[in-house]
Regions:
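Composition-driven recognition of glycine/serine/threonine/acidic- and proline-rich low-complexity segments
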Residues: 1-112
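Short Gly/Ser/Thr- and Asp/Glu-enriched loop/turn motifs at secondary-structure junctions
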Residues: 121, 250, 392-397
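ATP-dependent small-molecule kinase catalytic core of the GHMP/sugar-kinase superfamily
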Residues: 113-119, 127, 133-137, 228-388, ...
């Protein structure tokens, strides 16, 4: 038998990967005390060898440079950012090999080129509040900031502008955002942008806003600029309908926003999604609340469903709006007297009840009515499995459930439903009470 271990070592100040290491240790060659410590995954091998005085010598097996596009360089936190150094060696003790170690080190660690890293949250959009407009305002709503998934973006000095990612679709989206930022006046010097991790696009988790703001804030911060939140939002053109994604990026927590002034000559004069409402300005914040740390969020992301964005999204707004004013009144009551008190008092049952009721009224009901049957089946199954509240985020297809215990049964129920259709994945995450993080 062989002990196998794979680890990433990070710089705690900027979260950049220093080393990706894989080790193999023949169990029969290890002293007993060293073996016990080795089975503790949190204890570094170097400490064990030092304390047990196990190392006699090292034998280098190979040392090579891996080009940035070579598949062998594709290790977590290292993939394609730059060329890498690959080193393999054996640790010898009592004339026997006790460790075989393979290390990959980003070559840019040996350069003096500036690099910063941006980590964004994602968000659940619970629902738009007022898609009637009689009040003189429109939009408004509530949403939850999530710790995972999120974008991890690295921006480095370069001789020419370039974008890399393990997913061509992600790179294309980055390039589209860069074009928009340039068109809106952001000066962008030669940079290398690499996406280490991405939020799935067009699934209801706010990927467009997080990517746009992550790039705008990262590039301006890279150049030493400190722009206001409103200026960065203006550069991206986001937040023209919902203010949840923009507030999630800057503040985190559970967000309630006030929407936009509505009518001739006002911020908005028609019902439309954020993607075509860039001139509406950002929605004022009504309130923000801390998300209880003990609450879990289960995300079910079905595969193979039609993505609703662009023209499809615009058409749905035109078809469904204005919604009856009675629906707006009911949703306002649910928000004010159930959802907000539930989070203030950490009352998961009341909060979950509000989430469940939100699905049956106003624009959210319209969003759900156009979904394939798997979405309603997911919602029902996750509730039956014990989630206190289950809903669809934005236009979906992501379905989310909130619970404190019993997450595993909710995950199993969601996976069973998705496997009966076209498949999908689940994500277990927490609420996030801070916004994006930028480190250099």
């Amino acid at each position: 038998p062989v002990n196998y271990r794979e680890v990433d070592l990070y710089n705690k100040n900027n979260l950049n990967t220093l080393i990706h290491a894989i080790s193999y240790a023949p169990i029969s060659h290890l002293p007993e005390n060293a073996l016990v410590r080795l089975m503790n995954e949190d204890e570094p091998i170097g400490y064990i060898m030092r304390d047990e005085m196990m190392e006699s010598r090292r034998e280098i097996i190979s040392l090579e440079r891996l080009p940035s596009q070579q598949p062998g360089a594709g290790k977590p936190g290292i993939s394609r950012v730059s060329s890498s150094i690959s080193k393999s060696y054996r640790i010898i003790h009592n004339n026997r090999p006790i460790f075989l170690i393979n290390e990959i080190i980003p070559e840019n660690l040996f350069s003096e080129r500036k690099t910063i890293r941006i980590q964004t949250p994602s968000r659940i959009h619970i629902g738009l509040l007022d898609m009637n407009g009689e009040s003189g305002r429109v939009d408004g709503g509530a949403g939850i900031t999530l710790d995972n998934p999120g974008f991890e973006i690295r921006i480095s000095e370069a001789d020419a502008f370039s974008v890399t990612s393990s997913d061509a679709k992600v790179s294309q989206n980055v390039e589209s955002v860069i074009e928009r930022l340039r068109a809106n006046g952001l000066d962008i010097p030669p940079l290398h942008i690499h996406i280490d991790q991405a939020i799935p696009f067009h699934c209801g988790l706010g990927s467009g806003t997080q990517l746009a703001l992550g790039l705008a804030a990262g590039i301006s911060g890279f150049q030493g600029e400190s722009y206001s939140d409103s200026y960065l939002i203006g550069l991206t053109g986001r937040g023209g309908t919902s203010g949840i994604g923009t507030k999630a990026f800057f503040q985190g927590g559970l967000i309630v926003d006030a929407g936009h002034r509505f009518g001739p000559g006002k911020s908005k004069s028609s019902f439309a999604p954020s993607s075509v409402s860039g001139g509406a300005g950002f929605a004022p914040l009504i309130s923000r609340y801390e998300i209880p740390k003990e609450w879990n969020f289960v995300l079910a992301v079905p595969d193979g469903l039609h993505e609703i964005h662009g023209t499809d999204e615009v058409n749905i707004f035109q078809k469904c709006c204005p919604v009856p004013v009675h629906d707006v009144q009911v949703l306002s009551h649910i928000l004010l007297m159930k959802l907000i008190p539930g989070i203030i008092e950490h009352d998961l049952d009341q909060f979950g009840t509000a989430i469940n009721e939100f699905q049956e009224w106003g624009f959210k009901k319209c969003e759900l009515d156009i979904q394939p049957p798997v979405i309603r089946t997911l919602i029902d199954s996750m509730r039956d499995a014990g989630a206190s509240g289950v809903g669809m985020s934005s236009f979906g297809p992501v379905v989310y459930g909130v619970c404190d215990t019993g997450s595993s049964s909710v995950i199993s129920a969601a996976e069973e439903v998705m496997n009966d259709y076209s498949g999908g994945k689940t994500i277990l995450t927490k609420g996030r009470n801070q916004g994006a993080k930028i480190v250099s």
